[in-house]
Amino acid sequence: RRDFESLEEGIDALMTDVTDKLRKIKPDIMIEFRQSYVGPSIRKYGNMFRVTDCPCDAQLNRRGIIDLRFTSGKTAVHSDMLMWNVADTKESVAYQLTSVLYGVPQISMLIDKLPKEHYRTLKHYLDFWREHREILLDGKLTAQSPESFYNQVCSCLDGEAVITVYNN
């Protein structure tokens, strides 16, 4: 005897039951899913999607964010944890940060241990992100050249746009 006719029905019942019980305990609970098992149908169970692990790889982080944004509707898309070597140039730090502008950046560095140039660069781009967050996260997203890790990305909202061009 089967409880469900298909694996999909069983998984849906399990996930629905788990998320319903968690939301009864904490109505505003954050439930995160990682990129490797995210798709449009999983949106009803979670409220946060994160790019799969790609340490120190700005291009994969950017591609992961854009891929998730295209399939995730209004669900929040978070970058993989950003990290870099403290010996890196400020330009390298900026590249990591500009590559995650269209998602929610997650910084995995000890802020108080950063070189001053890195701290200023981080502050600059996080200030930019905060100022333009609505456009970046809620705007109509377009991107070119997935084979080049989306080297041109644009988000438009209410007559304003943020456009980035990356030289991979």
Put a short name on every predicted segment:
Residues L14-N168:
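Active-site-proximal substrate-binding groove within the catalytic cores of carbohydrate-active enzymes
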Residues R1-D12, W84:
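The substrate-binding groove and active-site-proximal loops of carbohydrate-active enzymes
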